[in-house]
Amino acid sequence: MIETVSTAAMPSEQETNATNSPFQTVKTIATLILLLLVLPLNLALTAIALLRSIIIKPFQSRTIAESPQTILVGGGKRTKALQLARSFHKAGHRVILVETHKYWLTGHRYSWAVDRFYTVPNPQTEEYPHALLKIVQQEKVDVYVPVSSAGGSYYDAKAKSVLSPHCTVMQLDVETLQRLDDKYEMATAAKALGLRVPKSYRITNPQQVIDFDFSDAQRPYILKSIPYDSIRRLDLTKLPCTTEPETAAFVKSLPISESKPWIMQEYIPGQEYCTHSTIRDGHLQLHCCCKSSAFQINYQNVDRPDIENWIRQFAKSLNLTGQVSFDFMEAADDGQIYAIECNPRTHSAITVFYDHPDVAKAYLEPDPLPQIVQPLASSRPTYWIYHEIWRLVTHLWSPKQVYERLKIIAQGKDAIFEWDDPLPFLMVHHWHIPLLLWADLQKTNEWIRIDFNIGELVEIGGE
């Protein structure tokens, strides 16, 4: 029987004078009603899956690991954390799932892959590494695999020094993480290794852009915040603008400063790719590559040896240990691959390993594997069903879009639902998200969209 342990109390009562706008309230209530309407269908699906498991379980043999380990997986509300928990569990290991106090309600805690569930303080607090250490010591954890947010990866890197004497930590050290998370520093490091990156400049004052000589530029440039910016990261305004005053006005509208530097980077038009790589002592252990875009949350592995070789050389040269995700562009003009940024943390594309038996080896084996673990050729693309339904409903006037969405649903696989582990699917959509929506009715912050992938309501200024 799965045991879940939460060290968090129920969320504190919101201030009574905090109210939403009428539109936000209607939107939230309407969403709650829609989730309630599909509850009977999902209950039936879960019941069928549970009955199926009861019938076939006696005929299944569970994998017994040669050296069973206890794995602590962080970021428990994210689908990628659930996927890793399932992969470790299927390989015969014991999984402890952890999340912050705010998300004590995560539906993933009900997964049969999870032996115990804990909550901890926010990563930004001084208590965070010590709370993790307490769990590591209490549960005799062998390996900690953080599944961090954009802002949380730094704090998991800091926690590594506290945890390392007690367990293996699959995380970059602070110095390396900051270097890779800094778009300009990453580009500089890659260029020094002879690896292809766009032309890049560190910007700490708008005047640098205003004074820049664009006359010899073969491609336009874009500006990106080096510290993570959830809103402006999607702004791909091309520079220079039509006129110099327009360029100056645009640049001055951005919060550029010494403390909040930006990168001015050559804009590479073409096909974007996202990757996930698990690396130990500079050796690439696990790798996937998927076509991508700013709004895409569908993942299907594609074979790109040139991208794999780029990452392999980079990882070996810097002797990395941890999880890193790179974004690449295949330029439409010259056909070359350019690395545009690195996110030193787990990528949601790891969901394409849902049926691979060797994921645990990639994380736990101390020696290089004879072959890199890559998604099976038979693996289906992954998606999140309610994201797809929303896209379908909002494009009903386009037969092409409707066909495309139905094709994705028919040929792919929901990233949360598993026939032999159905409870997370039910609990995320009818417990986790509804409770977040209910709490939102008492808040002043307005949510923009529901991200079922990371298990939260996306708000301006959020993660």
Predicted regions and their residues:
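Active-site nucleotide/adenylate-binding loops and adjacent lid/helix of ATP-dependent enzymes
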Residues: 177-262, 269, 280-283, 293, ...
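A long amphipathic alpha-helix within ATP-dependent nucleotide-binding catalytic cores
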Residues: 254-258, 294-336
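Glycine-rich phosphate/pyrophosphate-binding beta-alpha loops
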Residues: 292-298, 343-356
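ATP-binding N-terminal substructure of ATP-dependent carboxylate-amine bond-forming enzymes
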Residues: 2-171
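Peripheral (often C-terminal) accessory segments that flank ATP-dependent C-N-forming ligase machineries
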Residues: 5, 9-10, 361-463
